[in-house]
C-alpha cells in the first residue's frame, strides 16, 4: 500500500490539544466564528455541557463535464470536533470520506436558479473502501504481470501473422492496464494528500483563532 498519513485505526485523523488564555465561553464563541469562516453552510452540533462542537465539511477534488453534459464531481468530506474548556481545548478531524456525485442539467423550462440536479451519489469511506479498491487493483496488477511474463516466455518465432497480431494486441492491452493502474494509484494518493493538507491547514487556522499557546 502507498504510504498515507493514517493512524493505527487506519483513518486519516489529525488530533491535538492546546492551551489558551481564553475561558471556555470565549473559546466556544471563537470556535463558532472559525467554523462559519471555514465551512460553507455549516450546521453545528453543540453539546453545551461538555463544551463540544461538531461540524461537517467538504471540498472539491475534481470535476469533469461528460459528453452528455452530465457533470461528475468528487468531493472529500470530513467532520471536525472541538472540545473547549477553560484555558485549554482539544480537536479532532475524522470521518474522512469521498463523494462521487453525478449531476444532470435541468431543462431550461425547469430551471429556477438551480442548473443541475443530483442523480447519483456514491460515498467512499476512507480508507476502508479505498483500501478494498486498491487491494483489488494490486491483485489485478499481479495477474496482468503474470500474463505478460507468460507471453514473453513463449517462443513467438513460429507464430503466424494473425497470432502475432493478437499477441501484440494483448501486449498493448496489458500495457494499457498497467498505465491505468498506475494513474489510479497516483490519483488516490493525490486525493489523500490533498485532503491531509487541507485538514492540516484547518487545524492551524483553529490554533490561530484560539490563540493557542505552545
Regions found by a protein language model. Give the residues of each.
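Ser/Thr-rich, low-complexity intrinsically disordered terminal regions
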Residues: 1-214
Amino acid at each position: 500500500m502507498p504510504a498515507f498519513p493514517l493512524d493505527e485505526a487506519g483513518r486519516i485523523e489529525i488530533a491535538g490539544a492546546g492551551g489558551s488564555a481564553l475561558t471556555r465561553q470565549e473559546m466556544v464563541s471563537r470556535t463558532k466564528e472559525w467554523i462559519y469562516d471555514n465551512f460553507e453552510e455549516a450546521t453545528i452540533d453543540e453539546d453545551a455541557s461538555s463544551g463540544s462542537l461538531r461540524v461537517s465539511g467538504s471540498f472539491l477534488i475534481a470535476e469533469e463535464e461528460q459528453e452528455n453534459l452530465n457533470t461528475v464531481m468528487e468531493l472529500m468530506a470530513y467532520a471536525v470536533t472541538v472540545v473547549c474548556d477553560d484555558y485549554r481545548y482539544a480537536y479532532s478531524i475524522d470521518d474522512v470520506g469521498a463523494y462521487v456525485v453525478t449531476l444532470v442539467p435541468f431543462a431550461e423550462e425547469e430551471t429556477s436558479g438551480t442548473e443541475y440536479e443530483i442523480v447519483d451519489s456514491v460515498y467512499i469511506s476512507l480508507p476502508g473502501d479505498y483500501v478494498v479498491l486498491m487491494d483489488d487493483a494490486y491483485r489485478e496488477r499481479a495477474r496482468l504481470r503474470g500474463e505478460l511474463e507468460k507471453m514473453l516466455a513463449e517462443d513467438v518465432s513460429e507464430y503466424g501473422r494473425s497470432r502475432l497480431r493478437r499477441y501484440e494486441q494483448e501486449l498493448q492491452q496489458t500495457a494499457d492496464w498497467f498505465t491505468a493502474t498506475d494513474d489510479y494509484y497516483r490519483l488516490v494518493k493525490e486525493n489523500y494528500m490533498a485532503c491531509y493538507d487541507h485538514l492540516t491547514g484547518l487545524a492551524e487556522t483553529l490554533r490561530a483563532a484560539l490563540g493557542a499557546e505552545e
